[in-house]
Regions:
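Surface-exposed amphipathic alpha-helical tracts and adjacent flexible/coil segments at the periphery
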Residues: 1-22, 27-30, 34, 59-69, ...
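Active-site beta->alpha loop and helix N-cap motifs at the rims of alpha/beta catalytic domains
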Residues: 13-16, 34-125
């Protein structure tokens, strides 16, 4: 059954949550200070979480909290209190992987929907039905499942059971969370949110009779990336996503920047709305996914086994954020906060919530005291700039750069 999926965006901290909400997310997913699979995202303290939920709900956006680590014996005793706190904060759904945590969530956070994490690698309809029978509202499917398999699953599971899939972002070389490379090589547990991503390392060969003598392996001028997955991007295939009966598309990236959360969410929002309304997708919004740092894109496993890509595995970083708009009046008099330096006379681009990207030449700016400023330099510096039109707060000023070669 064709349906328009909700867009679930990453919110690694309060700024990222605000960006995702304002740029068009239907729901955001985040973590508290425990059990959340992303130790290096900002995450939310007990004091911050109710504020985050309140902000999201004021904008009609749902909040999903990850509780998807595999807790050990000494951690389980802390789960009931933690789950009660999440329920009390008004969280809409919990993303769970451990069966014990799933059961406790039903008892201590009964008002929260229970969603099954991709950590469970659900890849067939019998597994999905089993979780539904236990009380799950939604299952997050393994990234390795094809669209054809999803269509079959949709036809063989209860209509009330929702299907969520990843549509954009980094992919794991292993089944999600089931890789032991990080544990073995660095002592950091991927099932506890601490993956060191050794699949992204550069490797060399060593012959056993020549210890200490390393032989480089070359894929390109940077070395080799034997296990380095490309990024997923399904923005050109949202029609197929809708036809498969998927209820929610998820953007990976809680540990990525607020700019990433905003731009990717906004791109999918506009393209999905166009497709759902029967319009041709606006290429300007589709192109926004090229304006964030990313590896070369692929469609993952959605269209079957994709084979291997050997031509390039480097990061693409062709755009840099210069500033964030904090206020702007009807005449285009804007107040901004500096992120990276730029100068009067530079060609810059602005994009914001429901603000179509446009290009302009940076004018002479003014500092907080009103003095002319040719080149703001201090990070987080507040300055003024005249724009040709009003733009919403949380809009970005960016410019084209060439950082890819430095990766």
């Amino acid at each position: 059954m064709r349906r328009k999926p909700e867009i679930l965006a990453p919110a690694g901290d309060m700024e990222k949550l605000q960006m995702a909400v304002l740029y068009g997310a239907d729901a955001v997913y985040l973590a508290g200070t425990s059990f959340g699979m992303r130790s290096f995202a900002g995450n939310f303290t007990p004091e911050e979480l109710p504020k985050a939920v309140r902000f999201a709900h004021e904008h009609g956006v749902r909040v999903h909290v990850t509780v998807n680590t595999m807790p050990r014996n000494d951690e389980v005793a802390h789960l009931p209190e933690y789950l009660e706190r999440l329920g009390g904060a008004g969280v809409d759904a919990l993303i769970l992987a451990d069966l014990g945590a799933f059961t406790l969530a039903g008892k201590y956070a009964p008002k929260c929907e229970r969603h099954i994490s991709t950590q469970q690698s659900i890849a067939n309809y019998e597994c999905a039905r089993a979780w539904y029978d236990l009380g799950a509202k939604r299952v997050v499917l393994a990234r390795e499942v094809s669209l054809q398999e999803i269509r079959e699953m949709r036809a063989k599971i209860p209509e009330e059971l929702e299907l969520e899939t990843f549509c954009h972002g980094a992919m794991c070389v292993s089944y999600s969370g089931r890789c032991l490379l990080s544990n073995y090589m660095t002592g950091r547990d991927s099932n506890r949110g601490q993956c060191a991503q050794p699949c992204r390392y550069q490797y060399a060969l060593m012959e056993e009779k020549r210890p200490g003598e390393y032989f480089p392996v070359f894929e390109d001028e940077k070395g080799t990336y034997i296990m380095n997955s490309r990024d997923m991007c399904m923005i050109d295939h949202l029609d197929d996503i809708m036809d498969a009966g998927i209820d929610c598309i998820k953007i990976e990236g809680r540990a990525k920047s607020a700019y990433y959360a905003a731009i990717v969410t906004g791109a999918y929002r506009h393209v999905l709305d166009d497709i759902a309304a029967g319009r041709e997708a606006d290429p300007v919004w589709r192109d926004e996914v090229e304006h964030v740092s990313h590896r070369h894109y692929s469609t993952g496993f959605y269209y079957g086994q994709p084979g291997q890509y050997y031509d390039n595995s480097r990061y693409i970083r062709d755009w840099q954020v210069c500033a964030v708009v904090t206020a702007c009046d009807e005449d285009g008099n804007a107040t901004l906060s500096l992120r990276n330096k730029f100068a009067a006379g530079d060609e810059i681009e602005l994009v914001g919530p429901d603000c179509r990207p446009f290009t302009m030449t940076a004018p002479v700016m003014r500092d907080a005291e009103g003095f002319e400023l040719l080149e703001p330099r201090t990070p987080q510096m507040i300055f003024k700039m005249k724009l040709p039109q009003r733009v919403p707060p949380m809009s970005f000023v960016r410019h084209a750069v060439s950082l890819s070669a430095k990766d």
